Amino acid sequence: MAALEKMTFPKKMTFPEKPSHKKYRAALKKEKRKKRRQELARLRDSGLSQEEEEDTFIEEQQLEEEKLLERERERLHEEWLLREQKAQEEFRIKKEKEEAAKKWLEEQERKLKEQWKEQQRKEREEEEQKQQEKKEKEEAVQKMLDQAENDLENSTTWQNPEPPVDFRVMEKDRANCPFYSKTGACRFGDRCSRKHNFPTSSPTLLIKSMFTTFGMEQCRRDDYDPDASLEYSEEETYQQFLDFYEDVLPEFKNVGKVIQFKVSCNLEPHLRGNVYVQYQSEEECQAALSLFNGRWYAGRQLQCEFCPVTRWKMAICGLFEIQQCPRGKHCNFLHVFRNPNNEFWEANRDIYLSSDQTGSSFGKNSERREKMGHHDHYYSRQRGRRNPSPDHTYKRNGESERKKSSHRGKKSHKRTSKSRERHNSPSRGRNRHRSWDQGRRSQSRRSHRSRSQSSSRCRSRGRRKSGNRDRTVQSPQSK
């Protein structure tokens, strides 16, 4: 019945009541405390076994550390062995090198000793050979002297042996340098292919580069510095030459009579500033050389030497005087300063030459003058005058030119006739030059020729006076 009731009347379902939050928290804490107590109990029960495990773990760690240390020690030992082996190898190599260097030094010392001994032996042999040669030479000289004494005792003539046939053949075959013979200087110097005959005695003294100025020193820079020529002028250079002339010429005149004094104004190095002094005799020139050589002037030491120049017409550039030299500053003939008052003008015309040279050149000059035209003859007559002052000659020439220009229209016929008479008659200067040249000959020939020349001179003077009278008479008409 009860089962039937249960089946027919089911039991009413009940749902649990949800606890509150506070209860829930309390139950949770309780559960946690329970679990903690259980854990502590379990740990308390297993406490002894845990200590044993810890001991075994510690022992295992110690064993592991010991193994690691042992392996590290073995590794370090192996590394030390490698380093030691390497060091031993390096030490062995170093030792071998030191031994090799020591052996090489010993070998070098041995070779040097052998070379020194060989050199000493050669020097001894050379010294012995020299002594032997010297002894042989002395014996030969002594033998020659003994032979010479014997020859003298036997009254036989003795002389020095003849030189070899080919001795100085090249020097003899070489031609003389024309520039050195004419100017006493050559631009090639010792490198010249021609022969320079240096005189042992001469009346002309040469002092190289004695006269120097700023313009002459700066001449080399003209090609590279065209403005350098603005710092000096020819007037300043000539004024410096005049001061130099007045300063040094009295010193040269104190030694002897100076018949020529020239200063070169060339710009070439071998002629620049050269001073030429010609004395009347070679003895005076030698005295001047011994006096002035090595002296100091303007901060420079003088270098004096004998000069072969005696004919100044050949040495001085004639085109330079008329400012028509085509070579300019590269000319190898003398470009000289003009002496004040035209001093030593006689030497410029080679009047001071010896009688032999003048006599030998007189025939050639006379033949040449006979072939000269009126124009050349007129200027040669002007050069042959005795007037020592060139200014006076220039003045007279200027006056004659003015007179000729004033009478050019009306007096042309008379001038041509007078010029022909002058051309046919001997000139005054030529007669004087001829009488001076031939005055050193014998007295009879000199007196005879002086009479003939005086008569011709009187005739030429009479003709010139008559020509001057005609000019003075007709000059008022021309005016």
Curated annotation (Swiss-Prot):
Residues 1-63, 356-479 are annotated as: Disordered. A zinc finger (C3H1-type) spans 171-199, 311-338. SMART domains: RRM_1, ZnF_C3H1. PANTHER family: U2 SNRNP AUXILIARY FACTOR, SMALL SUBUNIT. It holds the Pfam family RRM_1. This is U2 small nuclear ribonucleoprotein auxiliary factor 35 kDa subunit-related protein 1. The gene is ZRSR2P1. Residues 50-63 have a biased composition (Acidic residues). Residues 20-37, 404-417, 442-451 have a biased composition (Basic residues). There is a cross-link at residue 67 (Glycyl lysine isopeptide (Lys-Gly) (interchain with G-Cter in SUMO2)). One of its GO terms (cellular component) is U2AF complex. It is found in: Nucleus. Keywords: Isopeptide bond, Metal-binding, Nucleus, Phosphoprotein, Repeat, Ribonucleoprotein, RNA-binding, Ubl conjugation, Zinc, Zinc-finger.
